[in-house]
């Protein structure tokens, strides 16, 4: 029985990995063995960081809300507590957007939170 060397299957597999490794530095975009490891590691980083991104955005929103709240004489925690007591149910993403793009609306919310405290 003759020996089978892989041929098109091997070439297709290597091309797929090297295509994914396009743009990597050094040997990582040229040599199949190195590229294969880096593509695997890159996939792990992407998987991990898709989950971490949620927390990073939440931290960014809280920092923005806190800065705007302090400009209106409240701390972040007092603002959030005041909004909850006033029955204003807004998520942090919306509050951060208001803090950056519509300072007057945020100020009105801060006043409502102060009244509720």
UniProtKB/Swiss-Prot annotation:
Function statement: Binds directly to 23S ribosomal RNA and is necessary for the in vitro assembly process of the 50S ribosomal subunit. It is not involved in the protein synthesizing functions of that subunit.
GO BP field: ribosomal large subunit assembly; translation
GO-annotated molecular function: rRNA binding; structural constituent of ribosome
InterPro entries: Ribosomal_bL20 (IPR005813), RIBOSOMAL_L20_CS (IPR049946), Ribosomal_protein_bL20_C (IPR035566)
Protein name: Large ribosomal subunit protein bL20
Family: Belongs to the bacterial ribosomal protein bL20 family.
PANTHER family from the UniProt entry: 39S RIBOSOMAL PROTEIN L20 (PTHR10986)
Gene behind the chain: rplT
Cellular component, GO, one term: ribonucleoprotein complex
Tagged with keyword Acetylation: no
Keywords of the record: Ribonucleoprotein, Ribosomal protein, RNA-binding, rRNA-binding
């Amino acid at each position: 029985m003759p020996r089978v060397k892989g041929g098109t299957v091997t070439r297709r597999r290597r091309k797929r990995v090297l295509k994914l490794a396009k743009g990597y530095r050094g040997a990582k975009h040229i040599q199949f063995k190195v590229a294969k490891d880096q593509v695997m590691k890159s996939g792990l980083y992407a998987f991990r960081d898709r989950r971490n991104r949620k927390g990073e955005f939440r931290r960014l929103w809280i920092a923005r809300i806190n800065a705007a709240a302090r400009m209106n004489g409240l701390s972040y925690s007092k603002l959030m507590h005041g909004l909850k007591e006033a029955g204003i149910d807004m998520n942090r993403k919306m509050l951060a957007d208001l803090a950056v793009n519509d300072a007057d609306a945020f100020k009105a919310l801060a006043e409502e939170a102060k009244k509720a405290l």
